[in-house]
């Protein structure tokens, strides 16, 4: 081939898609992240013909011959410049050779120091034994090509392959200049289309997102997902074919729904089951070339469109498919709005930097049709580049009647359970859709359960079961005790007469207030007997509005305000009135529509928002009342205390429950006034046997010693509580009290929308308490076949469910189909559940208690539960306030108006461990509550203690204005504190550029996603509001990470039950037994390789050394000399290293000592990216070594403790950054291992590797020296750090092992390796550099070419400077001293010396950038 005419080729600007990807490259450190790969297997083809066709296809798509080069001017982005030949892209090898690291590994290595001036595509051609082509692996950087471009190249390759079989062969090669001209034109057109879309559609999209955010729509924040991309790895795949494929096609045609939408619906259902949430953000990959021939060019033009989807947990398949289809069509209409712009709007409007999205990539053909005849099997995607979350890749093969589903996920996630079967579950959901089209979509994902009579969930074949008709009202066909109950109520029948005389007809509604006497209760009873309903108001001022509302929205009903106190009732109705009363009672009992008429209209509690009026029918109330006696055991010998406000639905249970059971009913007004002492006295004086209380009130009573004493002397036999979670500690206090234990306790649950109570759970019975872990269970249904669980949310269906809110159309209400053609009313409660170890559902908070705090989602219910677990806390309230989370708490000390700083401090630490980004803690004498037991939020926010706890707005405003000035200077345009970065047109690259100055100004390390989500200086200052109660964790410790660390702290430290071992290793003298160095290819591992080589070369005694690593050792450094050396084994491990693999290695080698050098040292990645190597593997290694009686040398680091000689580690829940947390956990795991394990934990200072390792590393010391030499200046700083080399550390550590030292063992202790103390200022001044202010140095660095050429090293230096800002004048040890620590159960702590040699020369070698050879 003739090389391109370099001098004639013009540089081509990047497309908008490529610019976005380049922004990502600048932020990410993994060269493999953007690798795209596809594998083809061919029928045998002549190599010469194949290469000729491949060369022609490359020339026809010349973007592949381009490299990225920065323009001579100070441009934002590099340009595409043709500088390569075909031979630079192609590698031919025999298929028998194989490549241990994969065919794309060499390309990844090429990109390790950056992607500028590097080939971005590699064709690896495989040949069979006969020399014919049998396979092709294509790897490219995503910035060069997308999926559509791959299809174009495939079509060209097919064309030229077909031509190569003709006598004339491929013929004239395509002209390079024409291809480059088409490429440039396509990029210009794409840029124009994007600009036009922004001009025409951006405002509409912003309004749409704002509306969705206001309605609570959109995806949940992925507290565990940083928003940064990670390498995608294939998890699993399946193929739908044969009858399953045909049935799916038939469904698509019958319902007129595209196949990709059906797949999306199935994926959404399965994902909803996995996440236990019905809110999703769906992202669809789109190829904008469609329909535009000018864009039909091989390059990267990829875009994605996103749309939010929120569906009811009981929604049918039909409903979800319909909504998803509409959302997809709407999203595709704005396909030219760039995904990164849409994301910026989404993050800014939703004030979050974390988005959990499901990506769907539906590909309508596995390859270009013309290529199929040459292929022996369908091509396979081997690498898909960066992804942010679960990605469902679906490939349609119409020719083979097959639909292939593949699940890809982030490589940095913990190892997935092999039984996850996500692809299989999606396939099963697709197969079941036709039969379940009108059933809940939860059933397709096996997420629909009915809670049975025993409280256990079970799957059902239909959404519900039709119930036999029940009584139309609670007083129709009632038990004999009802008559006696009514006869005891002296005002009931006079009230019925009054209603008759005043023209109140059946179906009307009485609106009134409570006069705190039996007279009002009797009116409510009389209303029902007369076929009417009632609605209670808090005050007389509310009567008129309530009556008007009911009149407007209750068709066929009239509302009648009544002044109860003013009505004068006769003692006994006369004969004529009695006849009219009897006629009315008979008329009502015979009314065929009685069950549908309103029994009461009651406001919701308002706990989760503005109270809404709920209409409950007589039929619903009758179904509930019929369940009270069997569920609670109430009977005619009971006396029920009516103490709840009549505006609360607890009063419904008290009044009508007593009526149907024939019990006595007595009243107390103490609850209404909040007089708990008075309530206790009434319980004693009035003699009730049963009382119904809000859980919060019961908690407070239990904390009141006087009240407990009074209640203990009463006739009480049962308390029914409900309204919020029960505290286990309070239950224990109850059963441990001799006077309270005999009183049974029943916890009830139910929303106002489903007639008072749906389930009940016995907590204390006969003085015995239910086990602690069972006390938050959902419980037993009041009525059979009414309680369901769908996607982790409680759904109530059947007669208990109301028709909905008065005058409000709410999606929580709907209907499900039992399968017999009928419909059952359904209500989605928003109450979340999990399943405990015994299979019972357990309450896990509410969906609507999740609030946004500083852009992050916080579950206030979970926070309240954690704080309530503190035994000193009597009461607590948790609510958002001015962008922060407020916690008001009450203890015995605060009740006496005393300070309780200890409790406040513990609460602050709890909030920090839960990842709450901004909060304040307020100690109060008492938590204000409403009569129904709910927290009175209005009074809470006016408590005088709040002013002292919350910082003033003036300081925050000044800080925001200062930050806006910093941005204005940097961007060259005026910005105010409330100016939107998005609205001002600040691009992604500009955001990356202002990030360093923003970090410096705020003194905090933050990500570009946090900057995007804040969008204004004012928001950002508010989001990063300080939490003085706890050490800052730099924003990395989100709720999910905190939970993961908590789990690891509890579970990984305790060794699992040993698994059965295989054959024992061959016997060895322990003093001369082999040593395994695990992770030998890393910096310290290579140090061991160098140290062992030098011992061998010096003729010193050395036991057999096994150098084991997952990656292939390089061909330079000590490795080439070690190969074939006697007593040295080099073992390459598999990609995953489990207990069985490690056990096999030990058995095979006969090792008696193991040095664990494996570890992820990247200080920039999140905890989940470190966990596998730094935590999980450490646990595995410790267990296997203990089981095999193998000594363990565990390598650790200085960053885990303020004092490296102390047997303590910083509490990983409070560590300053993820890497430190993971290393602290690792030490805790080793120290807590089996007593049989002989170990030492070796704490290392900074360790430098071989020269070739340093040249490719992003070590902070090397990076700082490199940056200083590039700038010819170093920052003024006083920093001293211990440093050693891998070789020196290895030599010192080997001396610890009995094979070298002759000692009996390692000693179950800690060994501190001491290096040389390096003063940064002294070191850097030795390079003849200028010393300048640190801020000025960092500013120069951020603007430098070095920063653009070395994004990885710049990121590390940037994080280092950010940490320095947090340290201030303190050393790192002094900084860590402010963090809580955990002691290690170890023996002695010893120190060994490992001084490095020629440190300055080594650093210079690491910084030296040899000239890159010019590319032809």
Curated annotation (Swiss-Prot):
Keywords: ATP-binding, Coiled coil, Ligase, Nucleotide-binding, Phosphopantetheine, Phosphoprotein, Transferase. Its cofactor is pantetheine 4'-phosphate. Residues 965-1028 form the Carrier domain. GO terms for cellular component: cytosol. Disruption phenotype: Deletion of the gene cluster mmaABCDE causes a significant decrease in the intracellular accumulation of zinc in Sauton's medium where metal concentrations are relatively low. One of its GO terms (biological process) is amino acid activation for nonribosomal peptide biosynthetic process. Residues 188-215 form a coiled coil. InterPro entries: AMP-bd_C_sf, AMP-binding_CS, AMP-dep_synth/lig_dom, ANL_N_sf, CAT-like_dom_sf, Epimerase_deHydtase, NAD(P)-bd_dom_sf. PROSITE patterns: AMP_BINDING. Its EC number is 2.3.1.-, 6.2.1.-. Nonribosomal peptide synthetase (NRPS) involved in the biosynthesis of a unique class of isonitrile lipopeptides (INLPs) that seem to play a role in metal acquisition in M.marinum. Catalyzes the final step in the pathway, i.e. the condensation of a (3R)-3-isocyanyl-fatty acyl-[ACP] to both amino groups of a lysine, producing isonitrile lipopeptides. This is Isonitrile lipopeptide synthase. It comes from Mycobacterium marinum (strain ATCC BAA-535 / M). The gene is mmaA.
